[in-house]
Amino acid sequence: MNESESEIQARLLAQALPFMQRYENKTIVVKYGGHAMGNPELGKAFASDIALLKQSGVNPIVVHGGGPQIGAMLNKMGIESKFEGGLRVTDQKTVEIVEMVLAGSINKEIVALINQTGEWAIGLCGKDGNMVFAEKARKTIKDPDSNIERVLDLGFVGEVVEVDRTLLDLLARSEMIPVIAPVAPGRDGATYNINADTFAGAIAGALNATRLLFLTDVPGVLDKNGQLIKELSVAEAHALIADGTISGGMIPKVETCIDAIKAGVQGVVILNGKTAHSVLLEIFTEHGIGTLIVP
């Protein structure tokens, strides 16, 4: 006899109950970006996942990126994107547009999606409540011919140096869901554009989050046969980088996970944001759907 839709929902809720209890009153930081952000249906599924986490007693915090949207706006305004060593150079005019797109446009779109579920989301960036302070990022690149490292001047690209959790602690005790754009001030008065992955890691570390989820366009970390690795320790992750199993763009992603764990996060997950309801599938099922990296 086939199950009705209501029977299926009841069964799934019963299976999820132990995990709801496990994460009750725990903080989960979700870095939202990639393909999921540009797909309206996936966006709605993401918003409903965040709402259900809140309704289940979890303290969810969303950090988002927006690289493609920034590039599109710069093109629209006739501003050429400049890159050094594969990284965007952010001059004064560009950082103003970055802040406008991240904190003024994308942030409010995500807030609106969550609010449509009946929950209350609030849009923030690192400037609000002096939550995050940054400084100019120090990046170097090695010249392939001379093997000499040179310092890159990326303008107003920053890295987090301080997180004050006061505002986030206040929001955790309220009904509000923080949605945070990775823009922050420096002690020098400048505004800095910060990589969303590292920004999310800094927030999660400061809060000693139970989980940090990175929604990406890939299933997670794959072994040499292309199979998903369900769980890795920090030591195992280092070994897989050393032997070439983890390569290319996955290296900085995994290194960010490791940094977050060193900062105090209990576990970091790389998962596929192109899967509908990926957040719930990761948190409220026994084996999850991504790669969990633990100390």
UniProtKB/Swiss-Prot annotation:
The record marks 31, 253 as: Transition state stabilizer. CDD domains: AAK_NAGK-C (cd04250). One of its GO terms (biological process) is L-arginine biosynthetic process. GO terms for molecular function: acetylglutamate kinase activity; ATP binding. Substrate binds at residues 66-67, 88, 193. PANTHER family: N-ACETYLGLUTAMATE SYNTHASE (PTHR23342), N-ACETYLGLUTAMATE SYNTHASE, MITOCHONDRIAL (PTHR23342:SF0). This is Acetylglutamate kinase. It comes from Rhizobium etli (strain CIAT 652). The lineage of its organism: Bacteria, Pseudomonadati, Pseudomonadota, Alphaproteobacteria, Hyphomicrobiales. The gene is argB.
